[in-house]
């Protein structure tokens, strides 16, 4: 008897996944050390889904730089210590028969918030409490009362170049960390979404002003990441702007 399509293997760019039941990326806000390094908690979390039989496990939104984190308690891939910790997790998932991708992202103007756990009261974490000044396509804060009045730095040419380099470097680190695929986070009102949406990107230079300008950064990031890794690459754009 043929198994249902859901439980049949799927091969994409040379990566064979054991079935089509995939775990989507879900932010955990569980790095209490606030250094971006995943812990034993993450090992158990992702390992349990591999034991449960998921095909591709997509690790949570992982920042390409410290200032790209949604909260100070997010994971990252900007240094070697993070690579080593992730490698322990990817090795475990592979030993359990699973495959694992990582969602690389930058929160942009929605960065430096409290962790979104039960009891979250909203608000941006200020620099004096371990936060930082977020960046965005303009100096306008994100929508929502938790962001009201919080300062944002508009990215200049050097800042945009750094964003592209950060994605490229993080993707290279993802390969060393043992990830089988990379997802570029382009949704949910985070930085790349902020650039391609006309609601948040009101720039008048070559990184805005019209459609081609607004999609320039997401495409540049995709090109940089594609050139840095040999494995499967995909992205997650947003179909609506309600999360900006």
Name every feature range the model reports, one short phrase each.
Residues 154-155, 162, 183-219:
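Polysaccharide-binding and catalytic clefts of secreted carbohydrate-active enzymes
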Residues 26-28, 105-107, 187-189, 240:
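Active-site beta-loop-alpha junctions enriched in small/polar residues
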Residues 2-105, 114:
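N-terminal capping/small domains of soluble enzymes
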Residues 105-177:
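Non-globular sequence segments
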Residues 48, 92, 166-173, 181, ...:
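Structural preference for long, well-ordered alpha-helical segments within the folded cores
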Residues 234-237, 241-244:
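Single conserved hydrophobic/aromatic residue that forms the stacking wall/gate
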């Amino acid at each position: 008897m043929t198994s249902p399509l859901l439980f049949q293997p799927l091969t994409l760019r040379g990566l064979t996944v054991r079935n089509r039941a995939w775990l989507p990326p879900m932010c955990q806000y569980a790095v209490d050390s606030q250094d971006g390094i995943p812990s034993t908690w993450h090992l158990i979390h992702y390992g349990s889904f591999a034991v449960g039989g998921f095909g591709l496990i997509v690790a949570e939104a992982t920042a390409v730089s410290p200032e790209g984190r949604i909260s100070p308690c997010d994971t990252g891939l900007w240094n070697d210590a993070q690579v080593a910790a992730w490698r322990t997790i990817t090795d475990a998932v592979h030993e359990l028969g699973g495959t694992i991708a990582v969602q690389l992202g930058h929160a942009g103007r929605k960065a430096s918030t409290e962790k979104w756990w039960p009891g979250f009261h909203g608000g941006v974490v200020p620099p004096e409490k371990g936060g930082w000044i977020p960046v965005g396509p303009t100096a306008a804060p994100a929508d929502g009362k938790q962001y009201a009045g919080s300062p944002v730095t508009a990215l200049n040419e050097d800042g945009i170049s750094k964003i592209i380099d950060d994605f490229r470097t993080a993707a290279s680190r993802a390969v060393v960390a043992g990830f089988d695929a990379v997802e570029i986070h382009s949704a949910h009102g985070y930085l790349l979404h902020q650039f391609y949406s006309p609601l948040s990107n009101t720039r008048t230079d070559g990184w805005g002003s019209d459609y081609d300008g607004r999609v320039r950064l997401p495409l540049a990031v995709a090109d940089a990441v594609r050139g840095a890794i040999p494995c499967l690459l995909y992205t997650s754009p947003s179909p609506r702007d309600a999360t900006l």
